[in-house]
């Protein structure tokens, strides 16, 4: 799940909470309080580009993103999310499709979560090794007030087109701090370690600072600066090694610092 997903889900929770507060109180004549009902929310985002864990996946092009989330009062949840991507970054791929579900709760003031994520890239395959880009992760998370920590661990054999990378880990530390006027300051630090012999060249770290503004009727806007740094130059001169129509190779620094702007609508 990406920065935009996290912002969309966090804003959805805020939006639903405000709606609940605005609802009329139950009358004293009611025999029993109504049981909390499951919630279903949808979100649509238009972003200036798609950056996931500090890496630019839409090759500097705009991205269209959408998701659907179901949350049960017991703490169980499930959802799906998709984004356009570039086939210059993912060979023969134009869509990332995520499916996820799990459980979350709280003890005292500390929140916790355990979820399974399945990432699908229809038709995408890195033909040099015959490896598909699909992979799966288990994510364990903790939250306290505006702080959060999450660790994702790859449980599939391969990781994003990299073969034999089971055990790849990504540590996500951050904060979403309300600063008044409907604004939230978004801070993030990430550390990715790719498992498997020789795969350490794909290790990376990334950081982000952003600001999200909640608007009326489920709308929000956000802006962020994000940057990554790889353990090698693999991200600085990233290429699939496939000649384009002119016979040249498409090469880009997918880790360089960049600004991402987005508009999100929660339904």
Residue ranges and their predicted role:
Residues 1-39:
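Cleavable N-terminal export/targeting peptides
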Residues 40, 74-80, 108-114, 146-151, ...:
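Repeated loop/turn-to-beta-strand initiation elements of outer-membrane beta-barrel proteins
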Residues 38, 60-64, 93-97, 110, ...:
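Residues that define the transmembrane beta-barrel architecture of outer-membrane proteins
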Residues 46-52, 72, 82-86, 105, ...:
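Transmembrane beta-strands of outer-membrane beta-barrel pores
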Residues 67-69, 100-102, 139-141, 172-176, ...:
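Outer-membrane beta-barrel architecture
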Residues 209-219, 225-227, 250-267:
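Outer-membrane beta-barrel "beta-signal"
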Residues 32, 90, 197-199, 232-251:
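Solvent-exposed loop segments that connect transmembrane elements
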Residues 28-86, 258, 264:
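Short glycine/proline- and aromatic-enriched beta-strand/turn motifs that initiate or cap beta-hairpins
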